[in-house]
Amino acid sequence: MDNKHLIKDIATTFGAVIESIKDVDENSFNKIPFENSWTIGQVTEHIVICSGGVQDNKTGDAGRACDENLDQLRAIFLNMEEKSKASPQVTPRQPPHPKNGLIDQLERNKNHLLSIAMERDLEKLSLDMEFPYMGYLTRYEWLSFICLHTQRHLNQIRNIQQQL
């Protein structure tokens, strides 16, 4: 486990999302690029919803390496050929979306995640919520998931930009 690498990943990933959307005009930000696609604003809102923190009010000892599930998470979220539908609780609302407000929220989420990575014991198992098909994840794995999930949607944003 490498906290410095994770901290760098969080900062770099969220910085890349912000960079990719900051110069997009409001019309393009909220334009549906093709049928059954989200807008850049919807993808950004989805990232914001999914990156608000780690469910870790109740924790315990993992009894395993804190990054044991990392390869499986990478295989799931970095495979761009696999598509899945977002669950209702993380589905963004319909456009329009306020670009600057979402950028501000991305920045707040990034800072919150960085504080978790720097200040908390990442080896602890988060017992508040199970990850589908994997069970409980450590804080390290949850933060890694958030990065991988965000990277996946950064790719989606870039693909949408090419269609506009």
Each predicted region: which residue ranges?
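Acidic interhelical loop/turn segments
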Residues: 22-33, 91-97, 111-142
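Short, contiguous alpha-helical
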Residues: 31-78, 123-164
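Residues that form generic nucleotide/phosphate-binding pockets
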Residues: 9, 20, 76-79, 105, ...
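Short, helix-capping/interhelical loops that line the mouth of catalytic, cofactor-
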Residues: 1-5, 53-105
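Hydrophobic packing residues in well-ordered alpha-helices of helical domains and bundles
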Residues: 3, 7-10, 40, 102-106, ...
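Charge-rich, low-complexity N-terminal segments
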Residues: 2, 6-9, 13-39
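Hydrophobic/aromatic residues within well-ordered alpha-helical segments
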Residues: 10-13, 47, 109, 149
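Structural signal for well-ordered, non-membrane alpha-helices
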Residues: 14-22, 51-55, 110-121, 154, ...
